Amino acid sequence: MNTKIYRPALTLYKANAKGTGSAMKMELHPAHDQMSGCIMMSLASQKTVGDYRGPNPIYPTFDWENPITVKLDFIDLSKMLQVFRGEYESIEDGRGLVHRSPSGLTYVRLEHLVEPIPGYRLDVKLCDGVVIVEQRSIMLMPYEALGLVAAIESSLGVICFGVPMVENS
């Protein structure tokens, strides 16, 4: 029997007419064996501008070959949920999350905005020491944040405990 395995993912595309938009993909990685689960979050820059005129629209494209990707564990996701739920205006009073990796430091900042447009701004910066090497940002509307809250909350069980399996003996 062939079992097809897929990785659940949610992608939000935020293209604009200037070509400065971005997209965010959140991919669920359940806990297994002795490994904790996580959500791998990738942000990609917009590569091309779309053209919706005429009968054959041209859709914008995104640079998925060069995203900034960060692993969000249970604690990281819990801190993001606190901002989305309105318990805090930002993660760690604006300091955000800091992740160390062989490629440098990655900073993740999430803040609630009221003006000029209500929503949430998510910034991810990859730094080599103190120099910012790459940076991606995405603006999330309140309804997108609401959906993300539901998606993250429903993922926490498998992030913590994995997918229950019955072992055939």
Where are these regions (language model features)?
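Positively charged, low-complexity terminal tracts
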Residues: 1-169
